[in-house]
């Protein structure tokens, strides 16, 4: 039986047909050839992009952490005696976050943002959540994407006063402007995450005897949910996933408002938060079963 017919056969390689002394031996590579020089430049460019990507990931992580700290600080506003002190401190923290975003804008200067968007999207979403949470506490309204982007325009004056990252002398001498635009998807995802923080603020405010905030939050969340419903499944995949979480937050807030309206006079104020937490757990269990 031939090698081709047998199950364990093998095919000879083409160079096996040549005598050993006639095989082509590998030549020494000329490192100074135009082809090698071109590939070396490609290697340097790819390494530079990978390094930039890693720096952006680190900055995005810092933005996420500081934004979360700002959100935790703002949650203290339901129990703090002076709301203005909390808002002032939160503004200082957000200024620090914006300086991190300034460094991102400098890294992306002259680059296509979409090539590095995946590295910074998490931080931008968390920043949108923090700044929109602060804006809601101040005005009981939703901050627009244009307002957020106006806060992310930086000049060399910002670089000299607040930003500590090194820059070239030519760049310092020339009056320049850096900006970073929050994309519509980042904005929508940040607003969707905001609804969860508003739900927590609603429950905490009830525990402190504030019965007006839940109704204000409920009305606001209904408007946000209606807006997201217009997008539905036609928008980005991440937005459609957030829609379910938004609906959960709205249901919990509406349940709290219902209990306040119907049973508010029966339950002491210091026990309302416990009642709502129990009802919230029941809603979570029902949704988990379904």
Swiss-Prot record:
Record region (Interaction with C1D): 73-208
Keywords annotated in UniProt: Cytoplasm, Developmental protein, Differentiation, DNA-binding, Golgi apparatus, Isopeptide bond, Magnesium, Metal-binding, Nucleus, Spermatogenesis, Ubl conjugation
UniProt keyword annotation of S-adenosyl-L-methionine present: no
GO MF, one example: RNA endonuclease activity
Basic and acidic residues bias (residue ranges): 16-28
Cellular component GO terms held in the UniProt record: cytoplasm; cytosol; endoribonuclease complex; Golgi apparatus; nucleoplasm; nucleus; perinuclear region of cytoplasm
Coiled coil: none
Amino-acid positions noted as binding Mg(2+) in the UniProt annotation, renumbered to this chain: 129, 197
Cross-link (Glycyl lysine isopeptide (Lys-Gly) (interchain with G-Cter in SUMO2)): 279
Post-translational modification: Sumoylated with SUMO1.
Gene Ontology biological-process entries: cell differentiation; regulatory ncRNA-mediated post-transcriptional gene silencing; siRNA processing; spermatogenesis
Annotated region (Disordered), positions in chain: 1-32
Annotated localization: Cytoplasm, Perinuclear region; Golgi apparatus; Nucleus
Family under the similarity heading: Belongs to the translin family.
PANTHER family listed in its UniProt record: TRANSLIN AND TRANSLIN ASSOCIATED PROTEIN X
Biological role: Acts in combination with TSN as an endonuclease involved in the activation of the RNA-induced silencing complex (RISC). Possible role in spermatogenesis.
Subunit architecture: Ring-shaped heterooctamer of six TSN and two TSNAX subunits. Interacts with GOLGA3, TSNAXIP1, SUN1 and AKAP9. Interacts with the homodimeric form of C1D following gamma-radiation. Interacts with TSN and C1D in a mutually exclusive manner.
Protein name listed in UniProt: Translin-associated protein X
Gene transcribed to yield this protein: TSNAX
